[in-house]
Amino acid sequence: MAAVDDHLVRLDAGLLLLFTPPFDDTVLEPGYIKGYVPGVRENGGQYTHAAVWTVIAFAALGDGDRAAELFALLNPINHARTPAGAERYKVEPYVIAADVYAEPPHVGRGGWTWYTGSAGWMYRAGLESILGIRLRGTHLVIDPCIPQAWAGFRVAFRYHDARYVIRVENPHGVSRGVTALELNGVALGGQAGVPLVNDGGSHDVRVVLG
């Protein structure tokens, strides 16, 4: 992951590349990716599937600051916050682009939209890897990996007809590490997660990091 940070993350351009440098005039043939011009799609551009997996990897390593930073970098709305940014990006800022160009004169231009499976991966990266909320059978496993500066967050989760309001507190400014888990004011101790019941009621879940 250090190599990814060193060679593939371009914060100035808002890009997370698939690889670098792109294939151009090479003796050996790497396959179909050379059919794209350098810096476009799989040929050294940002290929968003792999970029999102980088977010998931940093969260798995416990680096909530980097995971959230790269999640924001990939968020399409951040590519169009200014008129200049929107002109450069050119595609819709409210859907995930499958790719973003990485070579002049089209650095930062969005590619194909509305069809990429990386949109689903982006959703999972935010919900499961950063907020740490995962459904496992009839249990809700909560293991956030968030920026240290976050004081916490709140999520309302619906399980059939029941509602679970999850409050995560981060009093010590850490990225990961659950020290307390409560359901309706009762400590759950060593349980693997929050047991879910479809009772039509509302339940409070408290998670403390430390």
Which residue stretches match the model-derived regions?
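Acidic, mature catalytic/reactive cores of soluble proteins
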Residues: M1-G210
